[in-house]
From Swiss-Prot:
Belongs to the universal ribosomal protein uL30 family. It holds the Pfam family Ribosomal_L30. One of its GO terms (cellular component) is large ribosomal subunit. Part of the 50S ribosomal subunit. One of its GO terms (molecular function) is structural constituent of ribosome. HAMAP family: Ribosomal_uL30_B (MF_01371_B). This is Large ribosomal subunit protein uL30. InterPro entries: Ribo_uL30_ferredoxin-like_sf, Ribosomal_uL30_bac-type, Ribosomal_uL30_ferredoxin-like. Keywords: Ribonucleoprotein, Ribosomal protein. Transmembrane segments: none annotated. It comes from Oleidesulfovibrio alaskensis (strain ATCC BAA-1058 / DSM 17464 / G20). One of its GO terms (biological process) is translation.
Amino acid sequence: MIKVKLVRSRIGCNPNQRRTLDALGLRKIRQEKTFEDNAVVRGMIAKVVHLVEVTE
């Protein structure tokens, strides 16, 4: 399981990064979600790695 926490603001991000955060379900700063560890989620995290904090 992977825990993903939004730590930086979405303001100023490009639209693709915003859609990725929406798909991850991260809308507010300090919001956390837990996901299964798979390639799809890893790829989404890689797109917004500068905005999130990941713990395994």
